[in-house]
Structure formats: structure tokens, C-alpha cells
Amino acid sequence: MDISFLVFITLSMALFSSNVTGTSVTSRVRRGINEKHCGFRPVITRIIGGGIATPHSWPWMVGIFKVNPHRFLCGGSIINKVSVVTAAHCLVTQFGNRQNYSIFVRVGAHDIDNSGTNYQVDKVIVHQGYKHHSHYYDIGLILLSKPVEYNDKIQPVCIPEFNKPHVNLNNIKVVITGWGVTGKATEKRNVLRELELPVVTNEQCNKSYQTLPFSKLNRGITNDMICAGFPEGGKDACQGDSGGPLMYQNPTTGRVKIVGVVSFGFECARPNFPGVYTRLSSYVNWLQEITFGQSLASLFEVVPIFIPE
């Protein structure tokens, strides 16, 4: 009698394969996780002073919501079809517990309350160094339960290149977007807003924050952070903008790269206290490990093969 044995093809075996669906594993690692069409805006407008964004001009922008009670939490950015990068503090409760299945993501929205498509969350990943009583390692990743469908309202943003040094952003203009509060009772926060800001040196930023009794900032402003804001204050990210992108748009190609994630600040738009952002280039390897692992999981599913004896 022939006996069939069930043999499982595992991920470790697949990694020895030189080519999978025409693309080598090693070349995928070297190439990084940016999609080739990332960072292109279907609607390109000039930002003058900041205000309400042209609808769908930042198509990677997402809103993160709490399920029960239903309320808006934070912003985030699509970096591929199943991954949204945001701030760790958006994904952890005040008691240090992960939100996990108590949140969902809304993509393709301009009016965050009345437009867009909801996606369920498969997994929440918070950087292993993050502590809810600290501002360090403030980065997290949301993995969606199914891939988003790209269109003129939904696109991925580029992230910094894999295995490259920090880019000097001092004196560079960057852009933030979000549905956070504006401080003006007559202005709604349900429509996406945009603001161009100058980057502030970490040295100057640290001088300002060292004057505060910040228990969450015992190591000061580090190289894993970016500061941006006007010396006179008046315009800044605020409550509800957390987790959203700090972006740089290449003036030649028009391509947009997310360089930071809205993390924290001293109140909102205070003079000489710029907003502080998690520097994405410090965490590209971390993002690479997670997102590449997810792509491998989809490529190398466990497949049963029956071999007759």
C-alpha cells in the first residue's frame, strides 16, 4: 500500500529559492519597501500659509478611529497596501495597553466624518522601545486585514531609503497634514488641513525643551527626532494631528517622502517651542523587517504537497 506523507514547504525553505514569481528575495530586500509609484500626488497645489487642503491632494493620509466609543484618534500614512505608519502613542492606551482590535482605519477621506472607506485592523505593532510614559521610539505600524485599493484618492507615500544616512533637513520647508483642532471655534476640524513649516535644528529645539520639567523627555531631543515650527508660534500641529506625516516634497520630481511622524509638543503653537516629530529614517530598518516579513508571509504560504512513497 502506498502511503502519502504530508510535507510542508516552509518560509525557511523558500528563502533558499533564487527566484519567486520572477523576483529574487535578495533583490526585494535591497530594493526596500517603497512602491515604485509612491509619493505622487494626483492633485498638486501650492501651499500658501496653510489652511484647508485641496480634497485628496494627500492621498496616503488616513484617519484612525476608536471603535467603542466611536471617536477619531489620530492620523497615519499609507506606505503600502496593508501598512499604515503612525505614532506609537496613538496605538497604546494611557495604561500602556495596545489598542489592537479596538480601532479601525479610514482611507481616501477629505471630510473625515462624511467620506472615505473603512478598513479593519489585523494587527497593531508598537516599537519595542516605546514606553507610554516616555516620548522616545514613538512609532507604530498598523497592518490592515485586507489590502487597500489604489485610486486617485488612495496612494502610498514614500519613506526614506533603506540603509542610508540621515538627510540634513535644517532650513528645509516641510509639510504637515491632519484633522486636529485648530484653536478656532469657528473652524471645523473634520476636513483635512495642511501647513508648511520650517525645520528647526535639534540643538535649538533642545534648548527650548530643556527649560521644561519634562519627565517624558529625560534624554532631551535626540537624533531620532525632528523639530519644526515658527519661532513666533501661531501655527503648529495640535491635538488630533498625532501620528500624521511630516513630509518633504522634491521640487524637481514632485515626489513626496514622509520624513517624520507627529509625536509631541509643548501645548500648541507656543513661541520658541517647535513641534517634535519621530524621524522616519531612524526606523527604516524596523519598518523593513516588519513589512518585508508580511510580504514574505503572503508569498510563501504553507502549501501541503503529497509525495507517494
UniProtKB/Swiss-Prot annotation:
SUPFAM superfamilies: Trypsin-like serine proteases. Keywords: Disulfide bond, Glycoprotein, Hemolymph clotting, Hydrolase, Protease, Serine protease, Signal, Zymogen. Glycans are attached at N100, N206. This is Clotting factor G beta subunit. Clotting factor G is a component of the Limulus test used to detect bacterial endotoxins in fluids. Binding to (1->3)-beta-D-glucan to alpha subunit, induces autocatalysis and activation of beta subunit. Inhibited by intracellular coagulation inhibitor 3/LICI-3 and to a lesser extend by intracellular coagulation inhibitor 2/LICI-2. It catalyses: Selective cleavage of 98-Arg-|-Ile-99 bond in Limulus proclotting enzyme to form active clotting enzyme. Residues 1-31 form the signal peptide. It comes from Tachypleus tridentatus (Japanese horseshoe crab). Component of the heterodimer clotting factor G which may play a role in defense mechanisms against fungi. Initiates a (1->3)-beta-glucan-sensing clotting pathway whereby the alpha subunit binds to glucans containing (1->3)-beta linkages, which are components of the fungal cell wall, and the beta subunit catalyzes the activation of proclotting enzyme.
